[in-house]
Curated annotation (Swiss-Prot):
Keywords from the named record: Gluconeogenesis, Glycolysis, Isomerase
Top-level taxon of origin: Bacteria
Record's keyword annotation contains Isomerase: yes
Protein name stated in the entry: 2,3-bisphosphoglycerate-dependent phosphoglycerate mutase
C-alpha cells in the first residue's frame, strides 16, 4: 500500500480578501501560516514521513511547504517545483472580488466560472500585465502552454501529464510524496484518483491547510482517503470555500 499526502496552501492574502487569485503570486496571511503549522503538527502526530516533496511555482504553496517541512524537521528533503501544479488560471477575473462579481453578474454565473468543469472565465489579452508570458518564471513555456484563462478541464489537462510522468512513477517506486498545491490543481488530482464525474466535481471543495491522505493500492487506485483533523472543523472550512462565490447579504 502507498500513501500520498495532498495539502492545499494555507489561507492567502487574496483568499482573505475573497478575490480570484489564479496565477497571481500572493503570500500567506498569518492565519495561513498557522494553518500550515497546524497541518505539520497533524502529520507529525499521525506518524507520517516523506521522501520527496512537490509544489507549484507560486509563493503561497512554496511557503506552505516550507512551513510544513520546518514543523516536520524535514527541510532537507528534495523539493520539485512545477508550473503544472499551479492554481487554475482565472484569466480576466484575477484580482476581482468574488462577492462583488456575484452581485454584478449573479451567483449562478460566478458558480459557473468557479465550479463548472469546462466553462472558462474571460480570457486575458497577451498585453495584459497579468498574462503569464510576461513573468520570467514561465520563460521556458511554449506559447501553447501559456494560458490566457483555464477551465477546470484545462487544468486537468495540464496536471495529468505531471501525474503520469512524475508522481505516479515516484509513488509506485515507494517514494512517500508530500504535495503542497492549490484548490483546483488538487481538485484535478482528486477527480482523477476518485473517478469523479464532470458534473459532480463542482461539489468538491478543498479547504486550506488541511492534509488530505490517500491510501493507494499497488496499481495506485484509492483504497481510502480522508482529511486529518477534526471532521466538523474540516467540514466548516470546506463549506466556507463553497460560499465564496455568493453575494454579500
Amino acid at each position: 500500500m502507498h500513501t500520498l499526502v495532498l495539502v492545499r496552501h494555507g489561507q492567502s492574502v487574496w483568499n482573505l480578501e475573497n478575490r480570484f487569485t489564479g496565477w497571481t503570486d500572493v503570500g500567506l496571511t498569518p492565519q495561513g501560516r498557522e494553518e500550515a503549522a497546524q497541518a505539520a503538527n497533524l502529520l507529525r502526530d499521525g506518524g507520517y514521513d516523506f521522501d520527496a516533496c512537490l509544489t507549484s511555482v507560486l509563493s503561497r504553496a512554496v511557503m506552505t511547504l516550507d512551513i510544513l517541512l520546518t514543523g516536520l524537521d524535514r527541510l532537507w528533503l528534495p523539493v520539485t517545483k512545477s508550473w503544472r501544479l499551479n492554481e487554475r488560471h482565472y484569466g480576466g477575473l484575477q484580482g476581482l472580488n468574488k462577492a462583488e462579481m456575484a452581485a454584478q453578474y449573479g451567483e449562478e454565473q460566478v458558480f459557473v466560472w468557479r465550479r463548472s468543469y469546462d466553462t472558462p472565465p474571460p480570457a486575458l489579452d497577451p498585453a495584459d500585465e497579468r498574462f503569464p508570458g510576461r513573468d520570467r518564471r514561465y520563460a521556458t513555456l511554449t506559447d501553447a502552454e501559456l494560458p490566457r484563462c483555464e477551465s477546470l478541464k484545462d487544468t486537468v489537462a495540464r496536471v495529468m501529464p505531471f501525474w503520469h510522468d512524475v508522481m505516479a512513477p515516484a509513488i509506485a517506486s515507494g517514494t512517500r510524496l508530500l504535495v503542497a498545491a492549490h484548490g483546483n490543481s488538487l481538485r484535478a488530482l482528486v477527480k482523477y484518483l476518485d473517478a469523479i464525474g464532470d458534473d459532480a466535481i463542482s461539489e468538491c471543495n478543498i479547504p486550506t491547510g488541511v492534509p488530505l491522505i490517500y491510501k493507494l493500492d499497488a496499481s495506485l487506485k484509492p483504497l481510502e482517503h480522508f482529511y486529518l483533523g477534526d471532521a466538523e472543523a474540516v467540514a466548516r472550512k470546506a463549506a466556507a470555500v463553497a460560499a465564496q462565490g455568493k453575494a454579500k447579504g
